[in-house]
A protein has these predicted regions:
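Alpha/beta-hydrolase-fold enzymes
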Residues: 167-252
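Cap/lid segment of the alpha/beta-hydrolase catalytic domain
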Residues: 89-138, 180, 184-202, 323-325
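Active-site nucleophile elbow and catalytic-triad environment of alpha/beta-hydrolase enzymes
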Residues: 262-278
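Short beta-strand/loop motif that positions the catalytic acidic residue
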Residues: 282, 288-290
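N-terminal cap/lid subdomain of alpha/beta-hydrolase-fold enzymes
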Residues: 46-114, 303
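Conserved alpha/beta-hydrolase "acid-adjacent" motif
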Residues: 295-302
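Catalytic active-site module of serine/aspartate enzymes centered on a nucleophile-bearing elbow/loop
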Residues: 313-349
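Conserved hydrolase catalytic core segment
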Residues: 143-182
């Protein structure tokens, strides 16, 4: 889900930090599923590691990792995730080429706040995945060695697998389901959208002052949706500690909030997500990981253990709740699922 922007603090000594390259790719005359077109669609992306190429110049060792709603590719540049890139680790940068795209509507990629505001095309996950396929074409990646994604990136992983079958040799979706977003998962999103639109400062999207009251509601809903009850009880065992944490969470959430129009679009992009009927198209090895303390994707919703059987080489893993797991955000704490990543790479080699 929404993550604060982070510096590229990697799990190496400062003098040995790997380089993170950033670039933009422009798609001309990009058509969206709603029938709208943009003369230019910008996709921002980051890369790390060492590309290996075949005789035709195609990159053969690429790993693409998709971020969550409101995030960017930079959200993975934190020690709990970049430990996977260290020497000898599963995604060692000496032998892997990592691609961290900013999805449409996020980060440095084209989004409503660039100028069109609420007249921006109503993009969805299918549009976002198709654009990322064009980015891979641009980078000369015919087939990914691995596609990973967390939260929204998890859902986009299933969308990618069904819309672009065979373009990834293995897929590891973390923290999502394959059913339409309804129930509580849609409820909190709808409430966040409605809170922004109900703020008089929003002014139909043509605001000069950010609609902070509406954004505050969204931050509060986000914090609760991403909560980990057992972990939080251990971290804030007293009323005063919890009150202080609430103040910090609101301040940090507002500081990291997207533009209000961008946020509306980000939350609406999931409106027609429903890959479940098409999962049989995904014939490559898949390891799908959820966590038992994920409030957004709890074990009783979505029937992941049954849905995974539609994929011939699918495996579903549910991480048990503990004082160490991080709720929905367990998807970025790689120590909980690194062994599953190693096994997936081994069975898709």
């Amino acid at each position: 889900m929404m993550m604060l922007a982070v510096a590229a603090v990697l799990a190496w000594p400062a003098a040995a930090q790997p380089a993170v390259a950033e670039a933009d790719f422009i798609v001309r005359d990009f058509g969206f599923g709603d029938g709208r077109r943009l003369p230019e669609l910008k996709q921002h992306y980051r890369t790390l590691g060492t590309p290996q190429r075949d005789a035709q110049g195609n990159i053969t060792n690429a790993v693409m990792i998709g971020h969550g709603t409101g995030g960017t590719g930079a959200q993975f540049l934190v020690p709990q995730f970049t430990r996977l890139f260290a020497p000898g680790a599963p995604l060692d940068l000496a032998t892997h080429f990592i691609i961290l795209p900013d999805a449409i509507g996020h980060g440095g990629s084209s989004k409503p706040s660039d100028g069109l505001r609420m007249a921006f095309p109503a993009y969805d996950y299918a549009d976002m995945v198709r654009a990322q396929g064009l980015l891979l074409d641009h980078l000369k990646v015919k087939r990914l060695r691995l596609l990973m994604g967390t939260s929204m990136g998890c859902m986009m992983g299933f969308q990618f697998g069904t819309d672009l079958p065979g373009r990834a040799a293995a897929i590891m979706p973390l923290a999502c389901n394959v059913i339409p977003l309804a129930g509580r998962n849609r409820l909190w999103r709808a409430m966040a959208i409605n809170a922004i639109k109900a703020d008089p400062d929003w002014n139909g999207g043509n605001y000069t002052t950010p609609p902070l009251n509406g954004l505050r509601v969204g931050v509060a809903l986000q914090v609760m949706a991403s909560s980990a009850p057992v972990r939080m009880q251990a971290d804030w065992p007293t009323r005063d500690a919890a009150d202080a944490a609430a103040q910090r969470a609101m301040a940090q959430g507002l500081a990291g909030s997207a533009d209000a129009n961008d946020r509306i679009y980000q939350l609406e992009a999931s409106r027609n997500y429903h890959p479940a009927p098409h999962l049989a198209r995904i014939t490559v090895p898949v390891t799908w990981v959820n966590s038992a303390d994920d409030v957004i994707n709890p074990p009783g919703v979505g029937d992941a253990a049954l849905q995974v059987k539609a994929m011939p080489q699918g495996r579903f893993v549910l991480i048990p709740e503990s004082a160490e797991t991080r709720g929905h955000s367990t998807h970025t704490w790689s120590q909980f699922w690194e062994g599953e990543l190693k096994a997936l790479l081994a069975r898709s080699n």
